[in-house]
Amino acid sequence: MSKAHECINWIKEYFKDNPDGKAIIGISGGKDSTIAAALCVEALGADRVIGVMMPQGHQTDIGDSKEVCDMLGITSLTINIGHTCTVLMDWIAGSLTFAPHNKEYMPDAVTTVISNPMIKTNLPARIRMTTLYAVAALYPNSRVVNTCNRSEDYVGYSTKFGDAAGDFSPLGKLTVREVLEIGDELGLPEHLVHKAPSDGMCGKTDEDNLGFTYEQLDDYILGTGAVDAEVVEKIERLHKATRHKYKPMPTFSPNDFCALPSQVYIDFDK
């Protein structure tokens, strides 16, 4: 059985006890959301998949997102998060300017906030995930789709509590190479499946930002080819620096007070 059919069956199994539930998925127009949405449609039917487009102001490739929704025949919503991001950043800047007992005075707090790369990248991603869960609340028993893949996860190329969140992850254990193979197997348009992935904000591709290609990353993860030592060093450094994104939250337990924080996690099975 192909990986595509295995994944479709897995989604069916996930929803087995939730026969009326819908899959709520953010549609960016990139390969991951396109392929994850197509898998959900194959598993559940188009009437049980809701695509949510969330541009931040003007999105140059919004046409790709609309094409995905039209092609799959799914209900689509467009919610522009641009104003929300701007207002929230303004309020954060204002709080820094006038906060009592703030020992780090910021004379130009607005510039400090809007130019901070962590805020510029991660705030929109978290607002998008908040939006998806708000939409999910409108549809009883719906579940939010995580669209991250194994390659991105390995080097932490996602936002904690942003696109790294969700209720179920069809692509989380598949490398970019395997995701592309599924997209081709499903017969999805090549310009969507093989579109160069980017964050849609800085004008650079993911590979430009990472400093190596997904082919190199997948070769390293799967052990399928020689990878330059400098690239290996970059991959390992990113993996170690971002492991906190995927570890369970360290949680104090009175019975385990001698354990190190990194050894104490919530165990929901107990």
Predicted features by range, described:
Residues K3-I25, L39-E42, D47-I50, G57, ...:
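ATP/NTP-dependent adenylation/nucleotidyl-transfer catalytic domains that generate, transfer
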Residues S33-A37, I62-K66:
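Short, surface-exposed alpha-helical segments at coil->helix boundaries
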Residues G30:
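Conserved G/P- and acidic residue-centered "switch" motifs that form tight phosphate/ATP-binding loops
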